[in-house]
């Protein structure tokens, strides 16, 4: 694989023909692509004030923590093995298929998108302790030296930057509502240059409202229900219930919904043992992926009629959460690109491939670096 080689997904998710790739400056020039004002207008045009009321929040919360079936061990093991084998046929290991994938589309430019929690770091009881290993950091650094690389997280952008510690990356915090370009050059100059590295904040007008909702949730949820933790991610809020007694999960959902009745322009979504409070705009990790591709000069939709001159990008998106499904769906709609779900267990997903855990993510990233250097 050359430095602008390609990885390809199965036939139902990829157009196999690959054109000769162009060379791109990295970081990309500020001209071209979609600007910050454009991203704000796009989000405002798609505002949806009636979005995202999931039928039963308690059932949804339980679904984020699947349990083994309470049946005879031998029967349970056989059923689980059969289910896993069937799922792996549809979502094979990205490591096991790597060589075939790497050889399938030489000419496209890889762009790497990575979730943080559960992808680059393990899921832990205390979200403030979700640190990545030095080995993972080295793997991400190696990938970023060869391909445009972005961290796309529900976390506050500054928080995930402090965890990752690599200024040469793009960071899309708050589920893509706070996007900043590489800050290594800007950080050395400070001031105006650092401000210029902010590419997109489509929900800036919601900041006062989110601050008020945060204070209310801390009082009504974190201050009342043992184990609950409310995290301010700047443009969204996370209500963690991983450490809450399951018998109180319903109370968590009820209290959160009670607070949000006073904020009809905020909506509630579900993650892995976390309730997410976001502005009611049509902006998510999938839209962040589109925006970043366009800002890099590629076609956001995957065709030559969109913002890019042609479509020689091959996006690889790796994530473990429900919120990453928005990005996986975008890759499916593009017709090519690799969506990779990080999970030990079968899940409904739009991803084409799978990896079991952050350890396998690290191995996959290292293989990308090795292939690019060959």
Curated annotation (Swiss-Prot):
Any GO molecular function:
trehalose-phosphatase activity
Q: Does the keyword rRNA-binding apply?
A: no
Give a yes or no for keyword Nucleotide-binding in this entry: no
Q: Which SUPFAM superfamilies match?
A: HAD-like
- In Pfam terms, one family for this protein is Trehalose_PPase
Reaction(s) catalysed by this chain's protein = alpha,alpha-trehalose 6-phosphate + H2O = alpha,alpha-trehalose + phosphate
Q: In which pathway does it act?
A: Glycan biosynthesis; trehalose biosynthesis
Task: Please give the start and end residues of each transmembrane region.
Answer: none
Which CDD domains does the record match to this protein? HAD_TPP (cd01627)
EC number(s) recorded for this UniProt protein = 3.1.3.12
> Entry's InterPro entries?
HAD-like_sf, HAD-SF_hydro_IIB, HAD_sf, OTSB-like, Trehalose_PPase
For activity, the cofactor(s) needed are:
a divalent metal cation
Q: Name one GO biological process term.
A: trehalose biosynthetic process
Instruction: Write the record's keywords in alphabetical order, separated by commas.
Output: Hydrolase, Stress response
Family assignment from sequence similarity: Belongs to the trehalose phosphatase family.
Please explain the role this protein plays, according to its UniProt record: Removes the phosphate from trehalose 6-phosphate to produce free trehalose. Trehalose accumulation in plant may improve abiotic stress tolerance.
Q: What is this protein called?
A: Probable trehalose-phosphate phosphatase 9
Q: Report the gene name.
A: TPP9
């Amino acid at each position: 694989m050359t430095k602008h080689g390609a990885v390809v997904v199965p036939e139902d998710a990829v157009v196999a023909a690959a054109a000769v790739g162009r060379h791109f400056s990295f970081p990309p020039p500020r001209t071209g692509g979609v600007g910050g004002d454009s991203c704000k207008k796009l989000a405002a045009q798609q505002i949806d004030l009636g979005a995202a009321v999931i039928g039963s929040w308690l059932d949804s919360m339980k679904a984020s923590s699947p349990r083994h079936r309470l049946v005879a061990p031998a029967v349970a093991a056989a059923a689980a093995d059969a289910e896993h084998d069937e799922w792996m046929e549809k979502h094979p290991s990205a490591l096991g298929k790597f060589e075939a994938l790497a050889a399938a589309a030489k000419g496209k430019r890889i762009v790497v998108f990575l979730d943080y929690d559960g992808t680059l770091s393990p899921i832990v009881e205390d979200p403030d302790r979700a640190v990545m290993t030095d080995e993972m950091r080295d793997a991400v650094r190696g990938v970023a030296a060869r391909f445009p690389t972005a961290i796309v997280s529900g976390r506050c952008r500054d928080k995930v930057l402090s965890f990752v510690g690599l200024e040469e990356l793009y960071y899309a915090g708050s589920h893509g509502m706070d996007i900043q370009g590489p800050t290594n050059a800007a950080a050395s100059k400070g001031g105006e240059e650092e401000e210029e590295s902010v590419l997109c904040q489509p929900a800036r007008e919601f900041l006062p409202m989110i601050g008020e909702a945060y204070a209310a949730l801390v009082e009504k949820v974190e201050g009342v229900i043992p184990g609950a933790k409310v995290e301010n991610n700047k443009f969204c809020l996370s209500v963690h219930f991983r450490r809450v007694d399951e018998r109180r999960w319903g109370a968590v959902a009820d209290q959160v919904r009670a607070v949000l009745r006073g904020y009809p322009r905020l909506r509630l979504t579900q993650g892995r043992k976390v309730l997410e409070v976001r502005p009611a705009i049509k902006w998510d990790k999938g839209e962040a992926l589109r925006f970043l591709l366009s800002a890099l000069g590629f076609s956001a939709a995957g065709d030559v009629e969109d913002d890019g001159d042609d479509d020689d990008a091959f996006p690889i998106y790796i994530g473990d959460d429900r919120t990453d499904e928005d990005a996986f769906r975008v890759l499916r709609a593009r017709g090519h690109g690799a969506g990779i779900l990080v999970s030990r267990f079968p899940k409904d997903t739009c991803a084409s491939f799978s990896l079991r855990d952050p350890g396998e993510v690290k191995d996959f990233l290292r293989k990308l670096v090795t292939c690019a250097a060959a």
